[in-house]
């Protein structure tokens, strides 16, 4: 009985099927994007882009948006603005005879030591072919379990979806390798938003807003935006997903939007370029609290500061570069008077 009541309470918080045209961050954070399963979220992003912008997907699923007038897609990529959209999670690795599910972590080969601990006893969702199914990541009964391990690994994790047999699991539409995610999103009116991967969602929303609402951005030839899938797996600033995008585009410069803990200022930029895959990149970082946890938190004013910083880089930075180039050309010598 308690399982059914808890699952009913969890299922009441369902992500909207039709996101608004200008979603607040708390709505934008509702759709998960676990590693290798980013398509549902990226489809939402693509649906909100202006029709005149050229979009494409690469082999790993990243969404690439080319700015500029029609026919400008063949121009060399002057600047790439990128954000990783994927997040850690689980997949269903086993369906037990008693209806419980075993899970395996997605993302980094060795998750942080508290990764599973922070998800223990929390509501979760299995994203099936037909939609989301509510569940709970189990906590062992205190009076029945053996001594608690020093590090809680995935071998101790079970997912309860309210079924008591494999047939009951199948009736819910759940299959092996379906992704399992947490989606507890809390947004206070005019205050901070707390959600898994909140900083990544904020950066993606800032990029979407710039593409949709600022003509100088959408009309800028040689400028490309990338919403990168599989960025938390592999090396480099955006993992193997970022490496694939760099090989495809060969930009002159890549700007990576990401969250960072411990910042005193809302946004921190860097003028130092780092080489990667034959291109150069630098970060623009958003202040975030409780980074890399299921309750990652960002402030709306900080997100607005990130939007202004992006415009400063993309729009006004280009203007300053043109002015600097003009100033570097010495003035012509006046002709002698006759």
Model-predicted regions and their roles:
Residues 1-5:
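Bacterial N-terminal signal peptides that target proteins for export
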Residues 6-338:
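N-terminal hydrophobic/helix-forming segments and targeting peptides
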């Amino acid at each position: 009985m308690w399982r059914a009541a808890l699952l009913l309470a969890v299922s009441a918080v369902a992500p909207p099927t039709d996101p608004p045209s200008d979603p607040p961050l708390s709505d934008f954070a509702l759709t998960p994007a676990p590693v290798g399963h980013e398509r549902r979220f990226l489809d939402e992003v693509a649906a909100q882009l202006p029709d005149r912008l050229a979009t494409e997907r690469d082999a790993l699923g990243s969404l690439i948006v080319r700015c500029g007038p029609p026919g400008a897609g063949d121009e060399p990529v002057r600047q790439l603005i990128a954000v990783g959209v994927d997040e850690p999670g689980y997949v269903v690795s086993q369906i037990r005879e008693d209806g419980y599910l075993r899970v395996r972590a997605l993302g980094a080969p060795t998750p942080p030591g508290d990764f599973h601990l922070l998800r223990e006893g929390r509501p979760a969702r299995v994203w099936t072919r037909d939609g989301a199914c509510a569940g709970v990541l189990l906590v062992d009964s205190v009076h029945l379990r053996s001594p608690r391990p020093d590090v809680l690994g995935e071998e101790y994790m079970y997912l309860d979806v309210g079924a008591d047999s494999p047939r009951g699991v199948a009736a819910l539409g759940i299959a092996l390798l379906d992704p399992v995610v947490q989606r507890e999103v809390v947004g206070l009116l005019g205050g901070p938003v707390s959600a898994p991967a909140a900083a990544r969602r904020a950066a993606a929303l800032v990029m979407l807003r710039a593409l949709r609402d600022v003509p100088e951005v959408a009309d800028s030839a040689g400028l490309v935006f990338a919403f990168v899938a599989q960025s938390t797996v592999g090396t480099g600033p955006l993992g193997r997903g970022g490496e694939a995008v760099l090989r495809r585009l060969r930009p002159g410069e890549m700007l990576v939007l990401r969250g960072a803990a411990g910042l005193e200022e809302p946004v921190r930029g860097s003028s130092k370029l780092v080489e990667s895959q034959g291109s150069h990149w630098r970060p623009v970082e958003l202040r975030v609290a409780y980074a890399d946890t299921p309750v990652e938190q960002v402030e709306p004013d900080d997100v607005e500061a990130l939007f202004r910083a992006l415009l400063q880089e993309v729009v006004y930075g280009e203007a300053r570069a043109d002015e600097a180039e003009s100033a570097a050309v010495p003035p012509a010598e006046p002709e002698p008077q006759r």
